[in-house]
Regions:
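Short alpha-helical elements
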Residues: 1-183
């Protein structure tokens, strides 16, 4: 997996030192469907937090999304009118240190505030103490606040740019999720 992620290679271009492509692909999809990758991410996140002297389960997170173009035909995709991109949207939640807690991929036409409950509903059981979320202005609105309260008593704090800022501005709490998306 790390080999494919690093090189961005299609399955058929795996080097000959690997097992047959069909075997590697079959095991990857089997592990994905059994949610093994989620379990691995969960264990690594908790271990990394404990190593740094933090509680294993985060109590706060930072949510954001990123629209990306898709060139392939077929598959789910939509049009993000705000970013003028036809493709998919990566919706991620990180802890306050920028470690990935959960990610959801969906069509780009889903607004941020409509995609947030999809991300947060998945992690209620795995991270029971995570109840506060920092977000940007795209998540503002009572519709999202009501949905989060119904899901699991979430609270959301919108971190906005100052009205006088020009150009790029590092925002407290928000920069960690931006860094994670950039990687």
């Amino acid at each position: 997996i790390l080999y494919l992620l690093r090189g961005g290679l299609p399955w058929r271009m795996l080097p000959p030192c690997f097992p047959p492509v069909s075997t590697v692909r079959r095991w990857f999809y089997l592990w994905r469907d059994n949610r093994l990758w989620l379990g691995i991410n969960h264990a690594l996140l908790m271990a990394a937090r404990e190593t740094r002297g933090r509680e294993a389960s985060p109590s706060a997170g930072v949510i954001d999304s990123q629209s990306v173009k898709t060139t392939e035909s077929g598959g789910p995709r939509g049009y993000d009118a705000g970013k003028k991109i036809k493709g998919r949207k990566r919706h991620i939640l990180t802890d306050t240190e920028g470690n990935l807690v959960h990610a959801v991929i969906h069509t780009a036409d889903i607004q941020d505030r409509d995609g947030a409950p999809l991300v947060l509903a998945e992690i209620v059981k795995r991270f029971p103490w995570l109840r506060h979320v920092f977000a940007d202005g795209g998540y503002a609105g009572n519709k999202l606040k009501d949905a989060l309260r119904r899901t699991a008593k979430w609270t959301i704090e919108i971190i906005k740019r100052s009205d006088t800022a020009k150009g790029f501005e590092v925002l407290p709490r928000r920069w960690v999720v931006e860094r994670t998306l950039a990687w």
